[in-house]
């Protein structure tokens, strides 16, 4: 225990503990059976067999439940106004997805008050917490003027440390046919204004959004201001997004539904994470990424929910885990790792997505004896308790909830 006045917590009665640390447990997930976890001062102090657990000031007997690191959501778009349920219904009736739908959200976001945007973002973060996400990245991208993007970055930064400037989402309506002019504005006054509130710079490198040269300009302008690059790429067809991400050393390239062997090889030889977003492919009836080919080649894979009002209005990583196992041919172990340690890799974080001494005490317990149930029982709300920074943030059994700023 640490020599301070904090109260230590010990979780006992853990049926299966996922640590994601193979040095302390079995296999890549570092599994420990009949386990215990101790946290103190907001960090993990000890993990191991329950019969060797040190005493804590506060104890919780989990009665055989499985325990995992909190999910790490590395891709979300939570600052927006309105919704697009009618667009979803039309798409399900056979109309193809087009990026133009984003422009409907741009209008609704611009028309929303600060209070409305803040409340909606909090609501979605609360929802994410209830499904087990304890670290959430949040993108802008629905304001697309300097003032509106600055407002979005400020709202996001008030709620999470993982803020991404996605000003280059699609060219806004007032820049129709003038994407280069919009890019020039993003690369100058918009990044200048928003960079102090953000950590990441992102771009949608896709036909109908921004081409390779435009995406390169946005990313390098952000990098010049200290932002770390991420890329939306290869979602709708093969394209330059993957190769651009690797070239610039991006933390991740997200979607990657359409890849060549050269794309897969480039990712395998790089540190760029491939973040797969099955919720978007489910909701648009798009082709799922070839996760098996990526994993077999040695690519680091993360899973994200991609919560947004147009193409993936879900905050549930358990739902995405089930899809990844059923339709993307990932094993349950691979999907769990991708939603925890993989998301942490995509955010370049070593303190989350893992349960080992010194890691942040972000922990979730399931109403199930094994983590396998997350894929085995799709659609069932299995997350029973969530601790964030060592504090009980939500419990299905008590209704206890403290889902606020993700600090």
From Swiss-Prot:
Entry binding sites for 4-imidazolone-5-propanoate: 84, 142, 169, 235, 311
Main enzyme class: hydrolase
PANTHER family named among the record's database cross-references: IMIDAZOLONEPROPIONASE, IMIDAZOLONEPROPIONASE-RELATED
Name used for this protein in its record: Imidazolonepropionase
Keywords: Cytoplasm, Histidine metabolism, Hydrolase, Iron, Metal-binding, Zinc
Pathways per UniProt: Amino-acid degradation; L-histidine degradation into L-glutamate; N-formimidoyl-L-glutamate from L-histidine: step 3/3
Subcellular location, record wording: Cytoplasm
Keyword Iron: yes
Origin: domain of life: Bacteria
Its EC number(s): 3.5.2.7
Record's keyword annotation contains Ribosomal protein: no
Pfam family, one: Amidohydro_1
